[in-house]
Structures are given as structure tokens and as C-alpha cells.
């Protein structure tokens, strides 16, 4: 490993091997512990996209609130469908929800809000690129989740995991924003492993990962956007040797997007001071 890989592996907390039952139990217990430590929490809120990460996080959250209720705590899991108009993979969203069995499902079409925001910016002389409009969608989705959480005395659960965190492959204050991130510490293949253990439908964890935020590049695979495969990222996170080209790509993403992993800097926390 390179010196930087040593640092990253330690920071991202990915184990070389996991026991599915133990790892699931630890994540469920973390969610329960957080709720038990905050008396105001009566709901957990999460947007469900039909992809691996939200399906796994949603299932574990639902299992956690069911245990909490059995222990006498009033708490529910709210799954949120957040389409931008008509969602191309809407059937997979429904399949994920059928697997999760959330206590409540709320649907909010973000298209009117996003389109109006883009229009207002354009009228002010700010013409967003397609990529920037994609970030608008991600931030609107998170805004909606926090609004629901506020209304229902809840918190927002994030789907950030270590294979995503290392590359910064999320929108700052969009899908990167949340109160807790239960599946951090897992890489992509470990997330699939847990979904298999939880008996998720195979097509949900074998689905090609995509953020699907850009209108000009619908369903763009994550790996194409990143220039590196998840297997390579996972190997890197497990401390394995990978090609120098893949290593450089991953480390460039890590360094470039360091700001996404930090809260707003102050003059006391900025390392250059």
C-alpha cells in the first residue's frame, strides 16, 4: 500500500472480511442507540431510489424501528419516493419498497420545485449546466427529506458508504447530507453481501449503480463517471494492490473532494492556519 492508501483505509473503516449477521446487527444497534439517545426522535426518514444503497439502508432502518417498538419506543420508518417527473426505474423502486415494508410511504415529485429554481436562477442571469441541474435535483430531494423529518419529529438517514465517500461521489449538501450514515464502513461488495443475507431480490443488488441526475446522460453508470470500477475501489479500501492507474484515479478523487467530507471550515479548523 502507498502511504496515502494506509491513511484512507484507516479513515474509511472497511474490514477485509465481514460476517453478514454480525455486521447487520451492529448497524441496527447503531441506529437504535442513536434514537434511544435522543428523546425527540419519533421517525426515521429516507429517500428510496431503487438502488442498492437506499434499499439496504432502508431495510436495516425498518428492522431497527420494529425492534424499538417492541421495546416500547414510539418510532416509525418513513420511506420517501422522490421522482423527477416520471422515474425510468420506478418498478425497481416499488420492488425495493416491497422488500423493505416501510411503516409509511410518502411520494413527492421534485420536478416542479427543481424546474422553478432553475428558471429563477436563469432569470437572474445564472444559467446552470446539465451537471449543475443534477445537483439541484439531489439537493431538492434532501430538502424534502429534512422537511418531512422536521414535520414528523424525525431524522434523515443517509446512504453514504465508504466506496462512495472515498471518491466524493455525491452532491455536497444533497445526498451527502444526513443526520446519520449507518452503512459507512462498508464497501460496495459488502453492501451486496448484506442484501443477499437479508434475502433482497437479486436484481436490486445486481442493478448497475447510477446517480441518474443528468438529463443529457440518463442512467449514466457510476463507474463510467468515476473512471474506475467499484471492484477496484473495494480492493483499494481492503488494502489490496491495484493498478497504479486505478490507484491514482481513486486518490485524485479522494484529495479533490476532501471538502465534501468536512463541515464548513472556520479559522480555527482550517489546517492551513
UniProtKB/Swiss-Prot annotation:
Stored SUPFAM superfamilies: Adenine nucleotide alpha hydrolases-like
GO CC terms of this entry: cytoplasm
Record field: catalytic activity: deamido-NAD(+) + NH4(+) + ATP = AMP + diphosphate + NAD(+) + H(+)
EC nos: 6.3.1.5
Keywords: ATP-binding, Ligase, Magnesium, Metal-binding, NAD, Nucleotide-binding
Gene3D superfamilies: HUPs
Gene Ontology BP, a term: NAD biosynthetic process
Annotated deamido-NAD(+) binding sites: 139, 172, 179, 259-260
Family statement: Belongs to the NAD synthetase family.
Subunit structure: Homodimer.
Function: Catalyzes the ATP-dependent amidation of deamido-NAD to form NAD. Uses ammonia as a nitrogen source.
Official protein name in the record: NH(3)-dependent NAD(+) synthetase
Organism annotation: Staphylococcus haemolyticus (strain JCSC1435)
Name of the gene: nadE
Amino acid at each position: 500500500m502507498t502511504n496515502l492508501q494506509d491513511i484512507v483505509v484507516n479513515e474509511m473503516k472497511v474490514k477485509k472480511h465481514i460476517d453478514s449477521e454480525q455486521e447487520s446487527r451492529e448497524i441496527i444497534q447503531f441506529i437504535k442507540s442513536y434514537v434511544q439517545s435522543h428523546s425527540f426522535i419519533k421517525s426515521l426518514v429516507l429517500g428510496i431510489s431503487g438502488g442498492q444503497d437506499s434499499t439496504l439502508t432502508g431495510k436495516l432502518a425498518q428492522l431497527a424501528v420494529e425492534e424499538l417498538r417492541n421495546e416500547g419506543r414510539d418510532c416509525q420508518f418513513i420511506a420517501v419516493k422522490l421522482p423527477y417527473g416520471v422515474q425510468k426505474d420506478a418498478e425497481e423502486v416499488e420492488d425495493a419498497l416491497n422488500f423493505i415494508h416501510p411503516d409509511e410511504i410518502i411520494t413527492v415529485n421534485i420536478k416542479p420545485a427543481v424546474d422553478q429554481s432553475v428558471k429563477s436562477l436563469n432569470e437572474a442571469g445564472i444559467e446552470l449546466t446539465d451537471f449543475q441541474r443534477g445537483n439541484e435535483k439531489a439537493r431538492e430531494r434532501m430538502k424534502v427529506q429534512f422537511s418531512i423529518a422536521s414535520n414528523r419529529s424525525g431524522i434523515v438517514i443517509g446512504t453514504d458508504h465508504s466506496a462512495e465517500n472515498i471518491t466524493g461521489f455525491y452532491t455536497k449538501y444533497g445526498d451527502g447530507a444526513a443526520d446519520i450514515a449507518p452503512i459507512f464502513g462498508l464497501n460496495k461488495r459488502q453492501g451486496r453481501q448484506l442484501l443477499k443475507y437479508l434475502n433482497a431480490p437479486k436484481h436490486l443488488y445486481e442493478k448497475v449503480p447510477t446517480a441518474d441526475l443528468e438529463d443529457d446522460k440518463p442512467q449514466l453508470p457510476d463507474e463510467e463517471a468515476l473512471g474506475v470500477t467499484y471492484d477496484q475501489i473495494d480492493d483499494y479500501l481492503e488494502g489490496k494492490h491495484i493498478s497504479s492507474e486505478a490507484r491514482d484515479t481513486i486518490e485524485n478523487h479522494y484529495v479533490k473532494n476532501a471538502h465534501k467530507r468536512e463541515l464548513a471550515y472556520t479559522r480555527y479548523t482550517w489546517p492551513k492556519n
